[in-house]
Amino acid sequence: MSRRYLFSSESVTEGHPDKICDQISDTILDALLYHDDHSRVAAEVVVNTGLVLITGEITSKAHVNFVELARKKIAEIGYTDADNGFSANSCAVLVAIDEQSPDISQGVSAAHEQRESLSNDELDQIGAGDQGIMFGYACNETPEFMPLPISLAHRISRRLAAVRKMGELPYLRPDGKTQVSIVYEDGKPVGIDTILISTQHTETIDSLTENSAVQAKIKSDLWEAVVQPVFGDIEIKPNQDTRFLVNPTGKFVIGGPQGDAGLTGRKIIVDTYGGYSRHGGGAFSGKDPTKVDRSAAYACRYVAKNIVAAGLADKCEVQVSYAIGVARPVSILVETFGTGKVDEDKLLKVVQELFELRPAGILQTLNLRELPSQRGGRFYQDVAAYGHFGRTDLDLPWEYTDKANLLKEAFAIPLSEVRVGV
């Protein structure tokens, strides 16, 4: 019997209060790793009306100006006008940073396997920075191997920010959210049920002063300048039955940190798969790659994406877990939700042979420590908004499908059937 249902995912723009915090945290991380790629960083940020608080634990040989980094990032996002209730030049920036706990540091610098003389392997030298579970996911719903709802929500958010920054819709302000509800039949996306955009805006637009007229213009402009371009190259498009909601409260003038306080790490579902896959609970931004909340989640995505790209499954979720101070994962699980084309027990063994999931191995494979210096001091801050996965606008090592051929060879599948990822 055919099953029809809706699945929804949301995204937020770079001007959302929580995303401001994520981007400042990762800007600090980039600066520290650029000057000292062995920096240990856990940078947390809070924003409110006229206030930025930078806190956390940092151990590094690098010396950077946290206040200057925060102001520069806030201005880049678009908060340069005090009328927004939050401005790069006028906000207060407070800094309260401690060093990483030596109790944690000793377990990362010398893993349990090394301290107990259980291994001389170089990749057993670094222990996990914390216990925890991490997930990675991929599916064949989009060319970038992401679920369609989150892919579209991010596209709309990025386009919304772009038309603001280009001056195409000059009345837009930095804060905004999007949400897309997809119609599924038997597990396959077949239609667009609802598109929702909430975007901060000026009180009046041109000569329009009545709020109803303002909202009508915003809705018309967003359909033409944002929604239609996003769906230009997508097979599934909105139709006459698709609901298009814009600022459903009726008004969105007060926004950004003036409207809501923001905090690093509070948009973890937006950062990953839009709720389509499970999440271990750990946030990414502000954390150096010895912290497996971040690095192992990237590695799990890398594994899952290569499995789907190799045609071994239509959907794949990878779970890995760690104990603090221990190099080797406590557990690894590969789940294909009944879409696997090969024996799953063998698939797990092949994954363990082809992919390195110890922290030092992840750092080495994905080059996570060196990327900020290799990219001119800017890397992690660019993934801090619009999702860490499925990015077609950034060159991200965990999005490579360079292991797909090896996976196929392990199961004697013709290499001509490998799908190349975006």
Swiss-Prot record:
Reactions listed under catalytic activity: L-methionine + ATP + H2O = S-adenosyl-L-methionine + phosphate + diphosphate
The answer to whether keyword Cytoplasm applies is yes
Can the keyword Transferase be found in this entry's annotation?
yes
Q: Which cofactor does the UniProt annotation name?
A: Mg(2+); K(+)
PROSITE patterns, from UniProt?
ADOMET_SYNTHASE_1, ADOMET_SYNTHASE_2
Q: Name one Pfam family in it.
A: S-AdoMet_synt_C
**What keywords does the record list, in alphabetical order?**
ATP-binding, Cytoplasm, Magnesium, Metal-binding, Nucleotide-binding, One-carbon metabolism, Potassium, Transferase
Q: What is this protein called?
A: S-adenosylmethionine synthase
